[in-house]
Structure formats: structure tokens, C-alpha cells
């Protein structure tokens, strides 16, 4: 596979003023509750306890459309019982966005410090657990953020990432033997409910990817030598939609090594490294590379980094598909890109995404996780080779079979047109021959600008 660079008309797109915050129909959430309770029944569990806070909201949000913002919340589910949601002072009013009937209980310990604590606060948990029928013979599945595996502890299935005071209170009722970590119900690569999306969820992620990629493109197009990181970050033109992570902008080699550094006062210089990462909720787009227009200075970088890195991305995109395992993708990349091991790639070459930026990854050499219909995936390979600039392309996509594609096209025709345009650009301009089931969410999907001061040049597969 020969790699070249081609000149294109600089990409330009209108800004979209549409919110990624969507509350679905009641039936959607109730169906999800039914599915997760079916998983609980198979495990012999009587109740599910789902915890959320500002950072770890996605599992609760999946069942309610609600996130607790700067407070905490606890959802309790059981067969044949109305769901019960424990909330802080400010969450009680906000939770009225939930579109179906459930019991909401004020638990002021989930509020911020210094706010009102009524005398009966001490009794709230006991009463709530009793209302939901939790008793010594109950078996509880606890869902926080992570599940654990044997490599992390001999008692991995009773390792919990919920606050200790909640776990302790439940343990007083059912003992430790009556509890199990079942966050895997949500994000296990093989069966987790949030690892595959329906047509409406895909539409949200496509919208988020569109808005995010256009912000990143706007950022790149406005860069000029001498601009500071914090000034340049304003080029993202962020609206009020919730973000998936803090925006990353830095212009120094040290900043690249730090990876997640927020923008500071460093100024952009020609021939320096430029790094940007940004995402609205359910999306992330990132670019790292050289800010230069003088390619003659960087023949070594072209030969030893840019060409093999882009070739690796082409292999990644052309290999993924429904039924392909993540292990197959990794093994093919390592087999065909001898530079892989010297690129300093410390994380999985790709991962799954939902409302949170990284739910789990199927891209591992140790397990055979098949890519499935409805999966939302981040193409995300971070290279940090010694003696060369960092390199990072990250964009999101989904896999959809013919039926799911037809449903999406019918229900979301404008989004489908954007996807079709991106697919054509990847195949015709970049030379990346993706499969029919690959639905790109980013307007700069696979676009590698080798010289970031000139966005009219992109890398491509040489068709000759």
C-alpha cells in the first residue's frame, strides 16, 4: 500500500445549532429496564442498585434520561416494583425530565455540603430499601462505573466503586455474600447493554460527532503562529451542550506528552507540535501533528511516522466490520505495520463509546470480542514515538447492518446524507475502502493533515 498526499479544497461546514441532549420515549427506558432485570434474573439477583455522580452518570442516564449534574443519585430496580430514585436537593426538580412514572425520594446526603439536612435524612436509606423489598434473603447487583476482573483481585465480583457508606448500609442487610458487582451488565464487550445502540442513539452520536468535528475543523482552520493555547481554544466555539471531557489544546512537546493538559499560555510556533481534543457528550475528535507548511524540512517525519501511521489507520478502517473481532484488527495492524511497537502506543487501538467517552474496548490481543451490529466505536490510536512528534487521529463511527441502515435513513434523512458524504470522501478522496456497515460520524473522518498549517493537503492511499 503506497501512501501519498493530495490537495483538496479546504473543508468547510455550517455550524449546527441542535442539542445532543435527547430524552427518549418512555417505552425506550422501560424496555431497557426490562432487559437489565432479565440479566439480573439470570444471575439470580433480586434487585439492581445503580449509582451515579457527576462524572459517572451514564448508566443511570441510560435508564432515565437524567444525570445528577453536581450531585449524586441512586436508582433501585426490582421486578414488579416501580423504580425508586434517590436524589439530592437540586436533583428533585431536575429529575422531572424523566418521562415515565417512578418514585422519587429526597436523600439530602446526596446534596452538596452545607445544604439543608432534615432530621429524617438518617432514616431515608432504610425506608427506601424496605420500600423496595430488600431483606436479608435478597441478592443485590450493584452497578457503579467499573466491573473488575480476576487480575485485579481474588474477590473481584465483590469489589465495588460505589460510596462506602452505601455499600456498608446494604451489607448490613444482606451481608457481602448477598451482593455482586454487575457493572458488566452495562459495558461488558460481549453483552453489555450500552455496547450496542438503537437507531435513535445512533442519531444522537452522529449529531454529536458532526458538531464536534466541525468545532475541531474550525479550530484548525483559524490557527495562526503566535496564538496562545487559551486563545486558540475559543476557536472551538463551544455551545451549551454538555461535554464528554475537558477540552485539550496544547502547542508544546511537553503538552503532547501530558496528553490531557488543558490550554495554557504557550504560543503556537511554526514547525511545533499541535494537539487538540474535544467532544460534546457521546463524541470525541482529536488531532495531533506538526504545525508547518514546509514539508521539505520533515522528510524523516514523513517516512518514519506519517506514512506508517496513516497506513495503520487505513488498515484499521478497512478491517473493522460486523463479525470481525477486535483481536483480528490488532493482529493485522501489528503484522503489517512493523513500526507499531516503536510508536509508543500505550492504549488499545480503539474503543467503544456511549454517553461516556470510553465504555470499554474490544481491541485487545487477549480476547476475541466480535464487533457487533449497533456498536459505536472510536478510531483512536495515540502514537508517541521517541525522537519524533506525537501523532493522533480520533473520530467516531457506528456499525450498522442493512436493516439498521435502512431504518436510520428513513428516520434521519439529513444525518444519513452526512454519513453518505463522509463515506464517499473516505473512499474516493482518501482511498480508504470501508465496508458498507461503517457509518462515519465525523466530517473529518480519517483526515490526516500532515502539515497542519495547510489544511488543503491530506494523506491518502495512492491509487496508481
Model-derived segments and their meaning:
Residues 1-464:
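Active-site neighborhoods and metal-handling regions in enzymes and metal-associated proteins
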Amino acid at each position: 500500500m503506497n501512501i501519498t498526499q493530495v490537495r483538496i479544497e479546504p473543508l468547510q461546514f455550517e455550524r449546527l445549532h441542535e442539542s445532543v441532549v435527547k430524552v427518549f420515549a418512555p417505552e425506550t427506558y422501560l424496555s431497557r429496564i426490562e432487559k437489565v432485570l432479565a440479566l439480573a434474573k439470570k444471575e439470580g439477583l433480586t434487585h439492581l442498585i445503580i449509582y451515579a455522580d457527576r462524572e459517572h452518570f451514564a448508566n443511570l442516564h441510560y435508564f432515565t434520561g437524567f444525570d445528577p449534574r453536581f450531585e449524586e443519585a441512586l436508582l433501585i430496580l426490582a421486578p414488579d416494583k416501580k423504580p425508586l430514585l434517590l436524589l439530592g436537593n437540586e436533583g428533585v426538580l431536575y429529575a422531572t425530565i424523566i418521562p415515565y412514572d417512578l418514585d422519587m425520594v429526597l436523600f439530602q446526603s446526596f446534596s452538596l455540603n452545607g445544604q439543608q439536612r432534615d432530621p429524617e435524612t438518617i432514616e431515608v436509606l432504610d425506608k427506601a430499601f424496605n420500600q423496595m423489598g430488600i431483606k436479608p434473603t435478597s441478592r443485590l447487583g450493584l452497578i457503579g462505573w467499573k466491573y473488575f476482573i480476576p487480575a485485579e483481585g481474588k474477590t473481584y465480583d465483590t469489589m465495588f466503586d460505589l460510596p462506602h457508606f452505601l455499600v456498608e448500609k446494604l451489607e448490613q442487610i444482606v451481608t457481602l455474600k448477598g451482593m455482586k458487582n454487575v457493572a458488566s451488565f452495562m459495558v461488558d464487550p460481549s453483552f453489555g447493554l450500552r455496547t450496542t445502540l438503537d437507531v435513535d442513539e445512533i442519531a444522537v452520536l452522529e449529531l454529536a460527532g458532526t458538531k464536534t468535528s466541525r468545532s475541531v475543523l474550525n479550530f484548525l482552520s483559524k490557527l495562526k503562529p503566535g496564538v496562545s493555547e487559551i486563545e486558540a481554544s475559543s476557536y472551538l466555539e463551544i455551545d451549551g451542550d454538555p461535554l464528554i471531557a475537558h477540552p485539550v489544546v496544547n502547542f508544546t512537546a511537553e503538552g503532547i506528552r501530558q496528553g490531557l493538559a488543558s490550554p495554557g499560555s504557550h504560543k503556537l510556533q511554526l514547525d511545533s507540535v499541535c494537539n487538540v481534543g474535544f467532544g460534546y457528550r457521546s463524541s470525541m475528535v482529536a488531532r495531533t501533528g506538526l504545525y508547518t507548511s514546509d514539508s521539505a524540512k520533515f522528510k524523516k517525519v514523513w517516512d518514519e511516522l506519517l506514512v506508517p501511521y496513516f497506513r495503520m489507520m487505513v488498515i484499521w478502517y478497512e478491517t473493522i466490520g460486523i463479525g470481525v473481532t477486535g483481536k483480528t484488527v490488532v493482529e493485522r495492524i501489528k503484522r503489517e505495520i512493523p513500526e507499531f511497537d516503536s510508536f509508543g502506543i500505550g492504549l488499545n487501538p480503539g474503543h467503544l463509546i456511549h454517553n461516556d467517552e470510553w465504555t470499554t474496548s474490544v481491541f485487545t490481543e487477549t480476547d476475541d470480542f466480535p464487533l457487533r451490529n449497533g456498536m459505536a466505536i472510536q478510531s483512536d490510536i495515540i502514537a508517541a514515538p521517541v525522537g519524533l512528534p506525537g501523532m493522533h487521529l480520533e473520530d467516531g463511527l457506528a456499525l450498522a447492518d442493512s436493516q439498521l441502515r435502512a431504518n436510520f435513513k428513513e428516520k434521519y434523512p439529513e444525518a444519513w446524507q452526512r454519513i453518505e458524504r463522509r463515506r464517499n470522501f473516505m473512499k474516493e478522496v482518501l482511498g480508504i475502502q470501508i465496508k458498507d456497515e461503517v457509518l462515519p460520524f465525523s466530517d473529518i473522518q480519517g483526515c490526516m493533515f500532515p502539515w497542519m498549517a495547510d489544511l488543503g493537503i491530506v494523506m491518502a492511499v495512492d491509487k496508481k
